[in-house]
Amino acid sequence: NSLPADMDTELIKSQSSLGLTLSEKQAEAVRMWAKSPLSIITGGPGTGKTTTLRVILDIYKRVRPKGEILLAAPTGRASRRMAESTGHPEASTLHSALGLFADEEDRYLGGSQPLEADLVIVDEVSMIDMRLAAELFRRVETGTQLLLVGDPDQLPSVGPGNVLRELLRCGLIPTVHLDIAYRQKNASRIALNAHTINEGDKDSLAYGEDFRFLPAEQAGEAAQIVLDVYQEAVTHQNLLEVQILAPFRSRGECSVKRLNE
């Protein structure tokens, strides 16, 4: 029932059947996963995490056709996107997979049974707090492979802990970081520019209809620019299609509270 030690033949088969070509880094991630009971794949938007998962799932279903697979993510939206993008029939929220619900004091109640799966893949791990991670690790049985996928540069969970970053920092878990942003026909400039900014290359930003940069010297000036752009946008678009994302809830001139005032 174990996975083949030599993944090269399986990689060739899956790339051919799926009609895609992996980068060397993506192939390295697949090889790492194949020989690791616990492993991590990280990368920013558009770096090929989903493509890598598609190959992993294709290989697993071929070499272990009777193996139970569980895909999970912290939120309903993330789990639906995971199922759609990988082509797997179903993905669950972590709470549902673990049989958990929160009481009025935000304590987890419910399930205690081990996860009935041979391969567990969890996406958007940066959103998982310490308590949910503890429940997940407690329920994974010996012999079950656990693959964690996420972007360490995303905002950490609302709850306590920065689980993904701490797992990476410990240096004990096999990890591959995908660091090449692939330009696809419909790629968002926001995703591409996020990668560029992470690389510290502010001079190579791609500007267009979906990405503009409006400089401001003071926080108050920035807040006014945001409000001006918002008011202009809602005159041309449906009000429900326009959003403002602010870095803080109540701190500073550009907080959610001040902008709403």
Annotated model-derived regions:
Residues 27-30, 34-208:
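ASCE P-loop NTPase helicase motor core
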